[in-house]
């Protein structure tokens, strides 16, 4: 089975991604990373930074998670991200997404020893 840490990497890490050169980035990546199976995942964020940089967030600023849990951490620096959001006209199985690129601080939930990201909580 896929671990929470591996699922996080599949759903959120694209260190070498260059969405700026590809208008179909979200449509292609959401399929490639298996987020359009059974339904179209409504929203997903990809992070274009080295995995080590994202894993390091687990030792940065401790903040409350959206669900009230206390194991979330906010990155000190802003990171290159791409938000993929399903379009209103999108109909499964033909999932269609619009993309927004940004530089934002990320908030992730971390678990384990060593502590690694297992859930993408928010961007600020």
From Swiss-Prot:
Substrate binds at residues 7, 10, 41-45, 66, 85. Disulfide bonds join 26-84, 40-95, 58-110, 65-72. GO terms for biological process: defense response to Gram-positive bacterium. GO terms for cellular component: extracellular region. It is found in: Secreted. It is an enzyme of class 4 (lyase). SMART domains: RNAse_Pc. Residues 1-21 are annotated as: Disordered. GO terms for molecular function: lyase activity; nucleic acid binding; ribonuclease A activity. Pancreas. Pfam families: RnaseA. Keywords: Disulfide bond, Endonuclease, Hydrolase, Lyase, Nuclease, Secreted. The active site is at 12 (proton acceptor), 119 (proton donor). It catalyses: an [RNA] containing cytidine + H2O = an [RNA]-3'-cytidine-3'-phosphate + a 5'-hydroxy-ribonucleotide-3'-[RNA]; an [RNA] containing uridine + H2O = an [RNA]-3'-uridine-3'-phosphate + a 5'-hydroxy-ribonucleotide-3'-[RNA]. Monomer. Interacts with and forms tight 1:1 complexes with RNH1. Dimerization of two such complexes may occur. Interaction with RNH1 inhibits this protein. Its main location: secreted. Its EC number is 4.6.1.18. Endonuclease that catalyzes the cleavage of RNA on the 3' side of pyrimidine nucleotides. Acts on single-stranded and double-stranded RNA. This is Ribonuclease pancreatic.
């Amino acid at each position: 089975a896929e671990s929470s840490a591996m699922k996080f990497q599949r759903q959120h890490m694209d260190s070498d991604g260059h969405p700026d050169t590809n208008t179909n980035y979200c449509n292609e990546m959401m399929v490639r990373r298996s987020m359009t199976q059974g339904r179209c995942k409504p929203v997903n964020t990809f992070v274009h930074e080295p995995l080590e940089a994202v894993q390091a967030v687990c030792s940065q600023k401790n903040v409350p998670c959206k669900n009230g849990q206390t194991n979330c951490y906010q990155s000190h620096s802003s990171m290159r991200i791409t938000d993929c959001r399903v379009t209103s006209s999108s109909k499964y199985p033909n999932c269609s997404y619009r993309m927004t690129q940004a530089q934002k601080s990320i908030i992730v939930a971390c678990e384990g020893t060593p502590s690694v990201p297992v859930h993408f909580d928010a961007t600020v």
